Regions:
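Ribonuclease/tRNase effector modules and their secretory precursors
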Residues: 1-78
Length: 78
């Protein structure tokens, strides 16, 4: 991942990943090559990417020193 040596998943993010059937590798792929990036609420960052023509994964994270702390993961159907 560009600039991130470590990725830490908070419990809420893990719950959402389990709920949506998204694994760590899919989250990492969104961070490595997002289709879109920006600023989310509370000065957090987001990265999102289409996994298929109809499924969008959005990753909400905080940026630390060489670390991305994953706060939440969302799956949206388009």
């Amino acid at each position: 991942m560009p600039g991130f040596q470590r990725v830490t998943f908070l419990p809420h993010a893990r719950e959402r990943m389990e709920q949506y059937g998204i694994d760590e590798e899919e989250v990492r792929s969104v961070l490595e090559a997002p289709g879109e990036e920006g600023t989310a609420n509370f000065s957090r960052s987001y990265a999102q990417k289409l996994l298929s023509s109809r499924l969008l994964v959005r990753v909400i994270y905080n940026v630390g020193v060489d670390e991305a702390v994953i706060v939440s993961v969302m799956l949206r159907r388009r």
